[in-house]
Amino acid sequence: MFDLTGKHVCYVADCGGIALETSKVLMTKNIAKLAILQSTENPQAIAQLQSIKPSTQIFFWTYDVTMAREEMKKYFDEVMVQMDYIDVLINGATLCDENNIDATINTNLTGMMNTVATVLPYMDRQMGGSGGLIVNVTSVIGLDPSPVFCAYSASKFGVIGFTRSLADPLYYSQNGVAVMAVCCGPTRVFVDRELKAFLEYGQSFADRLRRAPCQSTSVCGQNIVNAIERSENGQIWIADKGGLELVKLHWYWHMADQFLHYMQSNDEEDQE
């Protein structure tokens, strides 16, 4: 179990929908500090969060997840002045715009990766940090493909690949930073938007999705926090239909074990 009591949490996302509901649950867990970095100001949401737990310090920065890493560094230098340290980094910025592939990939994948690369040195035990947990909030169509939202699905597959790679013991044994992902199923805030399919052939499906049964954002937010509390390094969870399910990870490349053994053997030889 991962105990959130007294933790310093940094949430990179829009403070609305799933992120807001997740933050509400976090505020009930006696966290000490919450930093919110998002693209637009939302003082009403911040006030709502503060009313849940007045003793928890909340900080806010306007943040563009697609900015250059050098600019991100400037932001997180300021974040660290207020936060002192980060125990939990949650990446939840998301965009589904099949007509703008670059923006979709940059928001969902590249921006998340750059944010992680920027924050990791502050958390890394080898660099003076205390370790911690990185949580990547992604989608179930990062596990199974979507013929309708092809660009969005590709970006979410990338999140899963990045999460599993960064969670490898090669890193975790050194930096003490666990990495996990939560894949959200269809959620009301998502399907209520006007959604465009990657190709016109899929538009009728995209239109029908708005009438499909979906979980509420509040239930999804609760299960994201539940997954955090139950997390172990490298785990992938599905938060869908009001439930929480641990993904059974599978290796498809039959050479994976041999290749890893080869790399480890060469590393040992280099140290001799």
UniProtKB/Swiss-Prot annotation:
Domain of life: Eukaryota
Binding, NAD(+): 11-34
Entry GO terms, CC: cytoplasm
Xref: SUPFAM superfamilies: NAD(P)-binding Rossmann-fold domains
GO molecular function: oxidoreductase activity
Binding site for substrate: S139
Catalytic residues (positions): Y152
Annotated InterPro entries: ADH-rel, NAD(P)-bd_dom_sf, Sc_DH/Rdtase_CS, SDR_fam
The entry's keywords: Oxidoreductase
CDD domains for the chain: ADH_SDR_c_like
Keyword flag Oxidoreductase: yes
Family the UniProt entry places it in: Belongs to the short-chain dehydrogenases/reductases (SDR) family.
UniProt protein name: Alcohol dehydrogenase-related 31 kDa protein
Lineage of the species this protein comes from: Eukaryota, Metazoa, Ecdysozoa, Arthropoda, Hexapoda
